[in-house]
A protein has these predicted regions:
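Short coil/linker segments at helix-helix boundaries
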Residues: 6, 25-75, 86-134, 138-224, ...
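Hydrophobic/aromatic packing residues within the alpha-helices of TPR/SEL1-like helical repeat arrays
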Residues: 69, 125, 218, 254, ...
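Short helix-capping/linker turns of helical repeat alpha-solenoids
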Residues: 78-80, 131-134, 227, 306-310, ...
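Hydrophobic face of amphipathic alpha-helices that form TPR/SEL1-like repeat modules
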Residues: 89-90, 236-239, 321-322, 367-372, ...
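Alpha-helical linker/edge segments of TPR/alpha-solenoid repeat scaffolds
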Residues: 151-153, 242-247, 277-285, 327, ...
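Short coil/turn and helix-start
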Residues: 208, 240-245, 327-340, 354, ...
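TPR/TPR-like (Sel1-like) alpha-helical repeat modules
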Residues: 253-262, 353, 427-431, 616-630, ...
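Terminal, low-structured helical/coil segments at or just beyond the last alpha-helical repeat
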Residues: 633-688
Length: 688
């Protein structure tokens, strides 16, 4: 059994060598042994799940690994393991497509495309189940997938014994949406084209089991591995209130029959994960009672009988709380650190490191950086070096690999210089950063500002040369003389700034693209050359098309492009501003953005510039702007006009006009105002 990461690394290296040499039976033998240990009850961190997830080198991008897994399935079709790996990779694709956004801001096309990837994952796992006498591992993964993205209709059709339809109904109901989802899936492959046969294990599902899908998949997994903590943790997670559950349901589950088979440390781990639902939301630093409640909760969890990895996890979470409370930024780029909080964070991380170094990498590296490089906690720099050294041989963390690359490139943190190893580490970090949502330019900027300017500059140049857009953008800032909120006038270089700006725009960095659009707009105000405005529009449109709602340029790009389009003479441009730009700002913006967009729309529908004037819609948008921000300038300016104030019988006339205009709203304007699926309660809808 691989009790340590180094034992596991040796086993993985042997499996990779066998796979590379097409010794597929040897790969099966190695995987069979590790899986059997897991089936027998092993819970080691570096077991079967870890080996499946990392067998195909994560330093390669997802499309490359998918193709390798497909070839492995073709060359060893009767083995369950390549199909399990293929399904796990498609599971990762689901996450990449859905992204790290909150559930409220994920676009429908992302859900649809993630559903297409889900179908590939489930189909691959059906192959695994058909080829495996005890497929507990993939049954646990199917539990997670059914909770996360729902069961596909075709799987339920197969289990009911009927004819399964993949995408005919979906294409008929929303052809444009299906095309968009296929386009989002395209970097990884095409939609599933054929379904495997249903394995006998999954036949004969009752109607009640269709109604309670999570219970069905959990029982399938537990029937094979009764103490499957991974499956139990998955089920518990989807009892969080955010997924429609409750803390009472979670506690009932922990105290219930399914968890009764667990040893005390395993059941206590479930208790820890239950508490994480609320501990994950950081308290207000100014609320002493809330802060005390959090500290007491973490202390209470550490009083439980926990295994090493769970205890390390709680310690890392407590350190993150310390980081949140210990970092104060009263003004932008003026950061103060609470020495008591940060010292406690360091103590927590030191204890966690002694228990589980990998946990510190996964859950605490950002906090450890802050302790060592910015808060300058005694001993934190030594711990930082120890953590990096302990994981160098086996880590697949892009964040850790970036720091290891810097250490090996420049001899930092007590490491010897090894240029070849530094290059390998940085290449791995670059490959894994997108999948892990890690910004390597932040590591380079922290290195530049807090450790070594030459080493930081070298990393930025290496990352920029490798095509990392954010690092190119950081180089633009550096050659303007400012990085990480600090001034570096010695680095000002207009020629380099211009060169890296062009490269960053070509590479698609949205911040640099937005800044160039803004600069062109400013230049147009000084010199009204139409070409400048057209270039500005084109760059803003790129930001609008490519940015996600959580990106920093999404809101200002929508606002600025809306203003530019609405200031023109073309009604089509004005309608684009209203429906494609102001609408999303209202539905997805914060309160200030909503107030701005609603005030703009109140003006638009009152005066009817580019769209038909409509007193009813003007009134609706005015009230929305007032609710979002009562002192908004547009509200104060527009209320007398829309409400008919200051005119004889103005208020009553305005009210009657609004009632009449309600029946004149076209469908597109109605759905802009009340939601894309809203339908007015009348029958004379005007066509778009």
């Amino acid at each position: 059994m691989a009790h340590s990461p180094h034992d596991a690394l040796t086993l993985r290296r042997n499996a990779r060598d066998a796979l590379h040499q097409h010794r597929f039976d040897d790969v099966d033998r190695l995987l069979d042994e590790v899986e059997q240990q897991w089936l027998d009850g092993s819970t080691t961190r570096f077991g079967y799940g870890w080996l499946l997830a990392t067998l195909l080198d994560p330093a390669q991008d997802l499309p490359t690994r998918l193709e390798q897994a497909r070839q492995w399935c073709t060359q060893q079709p009767h083995s369950p393991h390549p199909w399990a790996v293929l399904g796990a990779l498609w599971d990762r694709v689901c996450g990449r497509i859905r992204s790290s956004e909150t559930i409220e801001t994920i676009r429908q096309v992302q859900w649809d495309a993630a559903g297409l990837a889900r179908d590939h994952a489930l189909a691959a796992w059906l192959h695994t189940i058909a080829r495996h006498p005890r497929p507990a591992f993939v049954l646990g993964r199917m539990l997670r997938m059914s909770c996360y993205l729902g069961e596909p209709r075709w799987l339920q059709q197969l289990q009911r014994g009927g004819r399964a339809d993949l995408y005919t109904a979906q294409q008929h109901q929303d052809p444009d949406g299906f095309v968009a989802a296929v386009a989002l899936l395209a970097p990884y492959g095409r939609p599933l084209e054929a379904l495997p046969a249903l394995p006998p294990l999954l036949a004969g599902r009752s109607e009640e089991a269709f109604e309670y899908a999570a219970d069905y998949w959990l029982q399938q997994a537990l029937a094979i591995r009764a103490n499957d903590t991974d499956a139990l943790e998955t089920y518990l997670y989807y009892l969080y209130p955010r997924w429609g559950g409750s803390h009472a349901l979670m506690q009932h589950f922990i105290d219930g029959a399914d968890a009764a088979r667990l040893m005390l440390p395993q059941r206590n781990r479930l208790r820890v994960l239950k508490e994480r639902d609320w501990l994950g939301f950081q308290p207000d630093a100014d609320n002493a009672d809330d802060v005390a409640q959090y500290d007491q909760a973490y202390a209470a969890l550490l009083d439980l009988h926990l295994d090493a990895s769970t205890r390390a996890l709680v310690l890392c979470w407590w350190a993150m709380l310390d980081y949140h409370l210990g970092r104060d930024e009263p003004q932008e780029n003026q950061v103060h650190w609470d020495p008591v909080r940060m010292a406690h964070a360091h103590d927590c991380l030191a204890k966690a490191f002694a228990l589980d170094p990998a946990c510190v990498i996964e859950e605490g590296l950002t906090v450890l950086e802050a302790c060592a490089l910015f808060a300058h906690v005694d001993g934190a720099d030594t711990l930082f070096s120890q953590v990096l050294a302990s994981v160098e041989d086996w880590t697949d963390s892009a964040h850790a690999l970036a720091w290891l690359a810097a250490a090996r490139q420049s001899g930092l943190f007590g490491f010897s210089v090894d240029a070849a190893l530094a290059t390998r580490h940085l290449r791995g970090a670059l490959a894994m950063a997108p999948e892990e949502d890690v910004d390597l330019s932040t590591v380079a900027a922290n290195l530049f500002c807090a450790v070594s300017a030459p080493a930081g500059l070298q990393m930025l140049l290496d990352l920029g040369a490798a095509g990392d857009p954010r690092s190119m953008a950081t180089l633009v800032d550096l050659y303007r003389g400012r990085v990480g909120g600090q001034d570096f006038p010695a680095f000002i270089d207009p020629a380099q700034e211009s060169a890296w700006t062009e490269r960053a725009i070509a590479a698609g960095d949205l911040v640099v693209i937005y800044n160039r659009a803004w600069q062109l707009g400013q230049a147009f105000e000084q010199n009204p050359e139409p070409g400048l405005q057209q270039q500005s529009r084109a760059l803003y449109r790129r930001c609008v098309d490519e940015a996600a709602p959580h990106d920093r340029v999404w809101r200002p790009a929508h606002k600025n492009l809306a203003v530019l389009l609405y200031q023109g003479e073309d009604d089509a441009d004005k309608q684009e501003a209203v429906f494609d730009l102001l609408g999303p700002l209202w539905w997805r913006g914060d309160s200030a953005t909503q107030a701005w967009a609603a005030g703009f729309l109140a003006d638009v529908f009152h005066f009817g510039n580019g769209v038909p004037a409509n007193a009813f819609l003007a009134k609706v948008w005015l009230e929305r702007a007032a609710e979002a921000e009562p002192d908004n300038d547009d509200v104060l300016r527009m209320r007398p006009l829309i409400d008919g104030q200051g005119k004889l019988f103005g208020a009553s006339r305005a009210t009657r006009q609004q009632a009449r205009d309600r029946d004149k709203v076209d469908l597109r304007s109605w759905q802009l105002t009340f939601g894309q699926h809203a339908v007015p309660d009348r029958h004379d809808i005007q066509p778009v």
